[in-house]
Amino acid sequence: MTVTRPRAERGAFPPGTEHYGRSLLGAPLIWFPAPAASRESGLILAGTHGDENSSVVTLSCALRTLTPSLRRHHVVLCVNPDGCQLGLRANANGVDLNRNFPAANWKEGETVYRWNSAAEERDVVLLT
């Protein structure tokens, strides 16, 4: 079994890319469902903070290089494309999406960019 895609095919994302919406500034929101998903499969997120783009570059290289049939986890390459484009930690609304996902331990506070309630931001609602 081949682990990597041929170099000539690595310019494009592998087949199976799905759109789940558009960002506030109109960027496509895409995810890569795992062809080899199971009950143990997880979700890999990158690009949550737009000013931390190394995860997007690394994950993009992995998606373009690895054979899709080996991918056991679902992938969202860039949760916050507007923040990545603008070089901001937050999204286009000024919300830190990492502090906005619904969680049992979510609480209000003085954390940078925290919003008023969990899962209020449309970018997070589209993902959950």
Which residue stretches match the model-derived regions?
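Short glycine- and acidic-rich boundary segments immediately preceding or forming the N-terminal edge
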Residues: M1-F32
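Hydrophobic alpha-helical segments and their boundary regions
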Residues: P15-G16, A36, R72
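Acidic/His- and Gly-rich active-site-bordering loop/insert found
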Residues: S23-I44, T48
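Active-site/substrate-binding loop(s) of hydrolase catalytic cores
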Residues: S23-L24, R39-S41, E52-S60, T67-T128
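A generic local structural motif
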Residues: L29-F32, C61-A62, L127
